[in-house]
Amino acid sequence: MGNISSSGGEGRRRRRRNHTAAPPPPPPPPSSSLPPPPLPTEIQANPIVFAAVTPYPNPNPNPVYQYPASYYHHPPPGAMPLPPYDHHLQHHPPHPYHNHSWAPVAMARYPYAGHMMAQPTPYVEHQKAVTIRNDVNLKKESLRLEPDPDNPGRFLVSFTFDATVSGRISVIFFAKESEDCKLTATKEDILPPITLDFEKGLGQKFKQSSGSGIDFSVFEDVELFKAAADTEIYPLAVKAEAAPSGGENEEEERSGSKNAQITQAVYEKDKGEIKIRVVKQILWVNGTRYELQEIYGIGNTVEGDDDSADDANDPGKECVICLSEPRDTTVLPCRHMCMCSGCAKVLRFQTNRCPICRQPVERLLEIKVHGNNGSGNNTGQGETVEQE
C-alpha cells in the first residue's frame, strides 16, 4: 500500500511539472551597427517609473511586424510597392519589452512608399529637320521708305538683298496672298505692281524708279494702318523669285510655282513719320509654304572671315551652361540659340524652362551651321527634339 501511495504522489508531481508554463524567450542581442537610444531623464533617475510604463509582454506575439504608431502612415492610392527587404541594412523589429515611444533610428530603413516614386522619364521624340536652300534673301531690316527727290510727297521703296542665282523681284501694294503663293494687287488701278529682273550677286540694292512711288495723301488712315491679320491684305509685299527671266519656263515662273521668298509688311506712323514694319517672311519651295522665324543668337555662332581679336574673344559664342562648347541648339518656341547639344540633352531631363527667358520649352532644335559666306543664306542641318 505504501508503494502504491508513493507512486501515485510521484505521478501527480510529474503531471504538475509537465503543465508548467515555459519561460518567455530571452530578448535578442542589441544591434552592433547602431547603439540603443538613451533613456529619458526621468526614466534614468527613477527605474520604478520605467517598470511602470513598460507594457506587459504578449505571450502570443503577432508574427507580422507591427510598425510603430508614430511612424506608419496609410499609403495614398496608386503608390508604388515597397522595395524588397534588405537583410544587410535592415534591423530586427523591437522587442516587446522596448518602449514604442523611442523606436531605433534604423527603423527609417522602412521607407514610406510615397517617397519611392521615381520621376517619370519625359517623352522625347526625335525628328529630322528639313534643309532648305534659300536662293534669294531680302534683308528685312533694310526695307524702308525714301522720299522721291523729283516728286515731293511721294515715297519710294528700297531694300537690300542677296541672290545666288538670277531672278525677278516684284513689289505689290495692298497685296493678297492666294493658296498657291500668288500675290494679287487689290488696288492695281492706283498702284500697279513693279517688277525688276536681277542677276546673282551679294549686297544688291533695290529702289523704285522716280515717279512710281506711293502718295499716302490719297488713302485714308484706315486703309493704310488697318490690321493686316483681319483682312489678309498687306499694304506692301515683296516677292523675290529665283528663276531666270525670259527662259522657256517663263509661264511657270509667272504662276508662282518656282522657289520664291515673300516679305509682307505694314505701315506704321511714328512721330508723324510713316515707316515700314515687316510682319512675316515666307519661303515657297517646291510647292510647299514655309514661314521664316528669327533665331536669337545664331549670328554669334557663324564663323565669318573676320579673325580679329575682338571676334575671337566674343563671349556670345559659347554655351550659356558649360561656357566652353559653341552654341548649336535652339529653344522653341522662344527661339533662343543659347546651348550646346550636350547640355541641352542633359537639361531637358532637369527642367522645361529656357535658360534665357524662363519660358516653357516645347522643342529643342539642333542646327549645324556650315559657315557664312556673307550672303545670309546659310543652310542648316539639324534635329528637333519634342518634349511633353
From Swiss-Prot:
Its main location: membrane. Pathway: Protein modification; protein ubiquitination. It holds the Pfam family zf-C3HC4_3. Changing I321A: Reduces E3 ligase activity. GO terms for cellular component: plasma membrane. GO terms for molecular function: ubiquitin protein ligase activity; ubiquitin-protein transferase activity; zinc ion binding. This is Probable E3 ubiquitin-protein ligase LOG2.
